Amino acid sequence: IDAESNFYKFHNAAVHRGAHQLAEEATDAFEGARLKVANFIGAKEDEIVFTKSATESLNLVAYAMGNAEPGTRFALTSKDRIVVTEMEHHANLIPWQQLAARTGAQLSWFEVTPEGRLDLSKINSVITEDTKVVALTHQSNVLGTINPLEAIVARAHEVGAVVVLDACQSVPHMPVDVKKLGVDFLAFSGHKAVGPTGVGVLWSSLLNELPPFLFGGSMIETVTMTSATWAAAPRKFEAGVPNMAQAVGLGAAIDYLTGI
């Protein structure tokens, strides 16, 4: 609360958009928060995208895949499969339902056992050779189950699929290192990490391979009246004026979690 309040009182200006002192201070605070988030999950700064929520982060990935050029790595067709689990939050289920509907891809899922765990007994028949995406929660917000990522990630990568991880519950409650997890995309929200509402995070080392999600200011490299080129990630996915104070507040929350 103090971090957000101080930002609004003393540093409030649109980031990346001015050469005056206030804009420079705002940009430094915003990018400082990005560095804190990156360090907290073992990532690089340019792999961190600020969104308004984990829901938006997951939708960003699914929507961008739906916009991928045919024949590129993330383009899906009716010959492809998307895998989720029965324990997913709606934020990590419905975007993939919609992507399957848009592209004709088949949606499949891991079932949950009576003990509240994923049934991996048929992992090879769920994650098949034609699977392009495996999306799952790290820790269930309903059951508390911590999913066994190692086997799932290994099988997904064996068939060339990417793994999208909903880490909303795990990031605030346990050490999370994206390199050790081996996943390809990871999302979490600010408010579940004792931070503000209105801010979320998307991490990936593959961001520059995806097309943009939104278009507008701050995300372009060049623009004419007939065309535009995109800035490099993460700015490519941060169109418009971002939730600056909320990002700074999340940075303060990360400081708190780091100190526990």
What are these regions (language model features)?
Residues 1-260:
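Pyridoxal 5′-phosphate
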